[in-house]
Amino acid sequence: MAVTDPIGDLITRIRNAQMRRKDKTSTPGSRLRASVLEVLRSEGYIRGFTATDHGNGRTEFEIELKYFDGVPVIREIARVSKPGRRVYASVKNLPRVANGLGIAVVSTPQGVMADHEARDKNVGGEVLCTVF
């Protein structure tokens, strides 16, 4: 069955795995998912991820989740821009998550990046999700 919202699916898989205190979870691979996971890894919200090629052009990512004293590092992760309602923000209107303690993952013409990086590069885009 086709997934209509791949980022929403990725977020749900991460949230569900952390509620069950899993060390790892897997998700189908795509370039957009890889970019979002790379932002989460570089910001310290996940330990990392590995890509596995299953042939026929199908890849799968295995995500290593991160915990601190048994508590998930990601307290809250939420989808902002959805297939039915896209949310775009200029550089001036990029959201500040938890008063700067969290991040917003933004898809810009220069690639997928965290909100603070988009502000540094003076570029806006589609707000994919927020993480705290």
Swiss-Prot record:
What InterPro entries has UniProt attached to this entry? Ribosomal_uS8, Ribosomal_uS8_CS, Ribosomal_uS8_sf
Mention one GO biological process in which this protein takes part, according to its record: translation
Q: Which UniProt keywords apply?
A: Ribonucleoprotein, Ribosomal protein, RNA-binding, rRNA-binding
What is any one of the record's Gene Ontology cellular component terms? ribonucleoprotein complex
Matching SUPFAM superfamilies, A to Z? Ribosomal protein S8
Family annotation (PANTHER family): 40S RIBOSOMAL PROTEIN S15A (PTHR11758)
Which family, according to the similarity comment?
A: Belongs to the universal ribosomal protein uS8 family.
Under what name is this protein listed? Small ribosomal subunit protein uS8
Pfam families reported for this sequence? Ribosomal_S8
Purpose: One of the primary rRNA binding proteins, it binds directly to 16S rRNA central domain where it helps coordinate assembly of the platform of the 30S subunit.
Q: How does it assemble?
A: Part of the 30S ribosomal subunit. Contacts proteins S5 and S12.
- In which domain of life is the source organism classified? Bacteria
| Gene Ontology MF annotations | rRNA binding; structural constituent of ribosome
